[in-house]
Amino acid sequence: MKVTLIAILTCAAALVLHTTAAEELEAESQLMEVGMPDTELAAVDEERLFECSVSCEIEKEGNKDCKKKKCKGGWKCKFNMCVKV
């Protein structure tokens, strides 16, 4: 009886650990798919990030408040970066 109970509990624990690991792996793979844009899109994103941060830095150096450059196409300037809205 004890052996059967131990075997059942061991199998249940292994199943829980396996399921949890599988869910984490699936979530990570979905994040990787979503977070990996095409190279063309990445270049556009980097360009927008660069334009926005340079604009803010120039204005800060002139002892003015940073009036963030308006980002177009569903983007906005936040923390000196263009972010997707």
Swiss-Prot record:
Q: Which SUPFAM superfamilies match?
A: omega toxin-like (SSF57059)
Q: What does this protein do?
A: Neurotoxin active on both insects and mammals.
Identify the domain of life: Eukaryota
Proregion residues are 23-48
Molecular function via GO: toxin activity
User: Which UniProt keyword terms apply here?
Assistant: Disulfide bond, Neurotoxin, Postsynaptic neurotoxin, Secreted, Signal, Toxin
Tell me where it resides: Secreted
Q: How does it assemble?
A: Monomer.
Name assigned to this protein: U4-theraphotoxin-Hhn1a
Task: Name where it mostly resides.
Answer: secreted
Q: Which InterPro entries match?
A: Hwtx-2-like
One cellular component term (GO) for this entry is:
extracellular region
Q: Which family does it belong to?
A: Belongs to the neurotoxin 12 (Hwtx-2) family. 02 (Hwtx-2) subfamily.
Q: Which tissues does the record link to its expression?
A: Expressed by the venom gland.
Annotated Pfam families: Toxin_20
Q: Which residues form the signal peptide?
A: 1-22
Disulfide bridge positions per record: 52-66, 56-77, 71-82
